[in-house]
Amino acid sequence: MNTLRIGLVSISDRASSGVYQDKGIPALEEWLTSALTTPFELETRLIPDEQAIIEQTLCELVDEMSCHLVLTTGGTGPARRDVTPDATLAVADREMPGFGEQMRQISLHFVPTAILSRQVGVIRKQALILNLPGQPKSIKETLEGVKDAEGNVVVHGIFASVPYCIQLLEGPYVETAPEVVAAFRPKSARRDVSE
């Protein structure tokens, strides 16, 4: 069977130069381990806020490492060195605007400055590439969505649509732990993976 391959890219000048320890990749690894019931392999990269390096890294993960999903963290704000969305769009075959729109909607429930985010979602070849926030708490909120005090979903997180998108791109059938995030697919796209 086709193993799910995920690229994780933390984009930070200071973390990549050793000024402080990266928190983005560990947060993503922990979240994916709790959310995915499908086996997966990770390719991780810690790089500076340099557009050419970001573009090169995204292309390497998709074109050479055959990742089905690439998650970036950091570099999505309005500051001059925040070029992650620009690099992502530069290597995209198609834009998926709903992902960026939904990430901002989710984050606005927690902080008004979420409107300053320029996160995007794109497709390059067989892969979905998503720009996530830089803070671990915000990463989790964006992926899982907004829940009420009882744990019921009020606003769906973006990851609910990721497994079906990967399936549409002819990648592996991805399943999630519904208590973390329930993957959504139309009934016609569901399959019994125990077969």
Curated annotation (Swiss-Prot):
Q: Which class of enzymes does this protein belong to?
A: transferase
Q: Does the keyword ATP-binding apply?
A: yes
Coiled-coil segments: none
Nucleotide-binding is among the record's keywords: yes
Q: Which UniProt keywords apply?
A: ATP-binding, Molybdenum cofactor biosynthesis, Nucleotide-binding, Transferase
**From which domain of life does this come?**
Bacteria
GO: which molecular function terms?
A: ATP binding; identical protein binding; molybdopterin adenylyltransferase activity
Show the catalytic activity. molybdopterin + ATP + H(+) = adenylyl-molybdopterin + diphosphate
Q: Which GO terms describe its cellular component?
A: cytosol
Task: List the Pfam families.
Answer: MoCF_biosynth (PF00994)
Instruction: Please name the InterPro entries in this protein's record.
Output: MoaB/Mog-like_dom_sf, MoaB/Mog_dom, MoCF_biosynth_CS, MPT_Adenylyltrnsfr/MoaC-Rel
Pathway recorded for this protein: Cofactor biosynthesis; molybdopterin biosynthesis
Gene3D superfamilies from the xrefs? MoaB/Mog-like domain
BP-aspect Gene Ontology terms = Mo-molybdopterin cofactor biosynthetic process; molybdopterin cofactor biosynthetic process
Q: What is its EC number?
A: 2.7.7.75
The task this protein performs is described as:
Catalyzes the adenylation of molybdopterin as part of the biosynthesis of the molybdenum-cofactor.
Q: How does it assemble?
A: Homotrimer. Interacts with MoeA and MobB in vivo.
Family statement drawn from the similarity comment of this UniProt entry: Belongs to the MoaB/Mog family.
**PANTHER family per record:** MOLYBDENUM COFACTOR BIOSYNTHESIS (PTHR43764), MOLYBDOPTERIN MOLYBDOTRANSFERASE (PTHR43764:SF1)
Protein name as it appears in the record:
Molybdopterin adenylyltransferase
Q: What is the species listed in this Swiss-Prot or TrEMBL entry?
A: Escherichia coli (strain K12)
Q: What is the lineage of its organism?
A: Bacteria, Pseudomonadati, Pseudomonadota, Gammaproteobacteria, Enterobacterales
What is the gene name? mog
